[in-house]
């Protein structure tokens, strides 16, 4: 758990890569990735991360936002790395694989941002939230400010992370069929405590387009005049956000 916010090309990851060094995805990552704190500041497109408590409708939201921004929809792990997961059993190898996927995704995003906005479904916080929530219970969850919630220094952070929350009245409010449990509550608390990235919390809705509307409204209001970010024309009417849970 001490390494959850330190994503590096550790010896174990390099060893994992060498075992599969003939695989196309390993070659691409090993030859092209160089860890950087962030993209050098210059005029570019926006990088957005979409996270949800429940997976239902997350892909629809991501796809719709990418379409509105005339950008690229992406997911983590990248599709070209998906096949390797099925041959890795539980244990260290799989943990190293998931760390490696974050770097591959980061590199791919950096390549695209010069020409297109990127809307990414799942990223570091998705994995971290589930890991922390499984490891701790309600009484010993690390407090806000703990290093586990800190975005990794060497992993590209999104310009804004939209977190679609859950509600205890899941079926009535959102149409989701997953139960609201103590684990769900821990997930929400982890999402709210993350540090080092702008997190905006959104209310769920049966109609996912309501969530999309709120996302586009926030982007237009907060990034239209940003000195470092280009945005395509946005003409969708504004929406009402639940709350902005970070003040950074």
For every predicted segment, state its role.
Residues 49-65:
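Glycine-rich phosphate-binding P-loop
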Residues 127-190:
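A glycine- and Lys/Arg-enriched "phosphate-lid" helix/loop adjacent to the NTP-binding pocket
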Residues 48, 74, 119, 160-163, ...:
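Hydrophobic/aromatic beta-strand patches that form the interior of the parallel beta-sheet core
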Residues 51-53, 123-124, 129, 165-167, ...:
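Anionic group-transfer/hydrolysis microenvironments
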Residues 1-42, 61-64, 169-248:
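NTP-dependent small-molecule kinase module
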Residues 70-142:
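ATP-dependent small-molecule kinase phosphotransfer cores
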Residues 64-72, 162:
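Amphipathic alpha-helical segments
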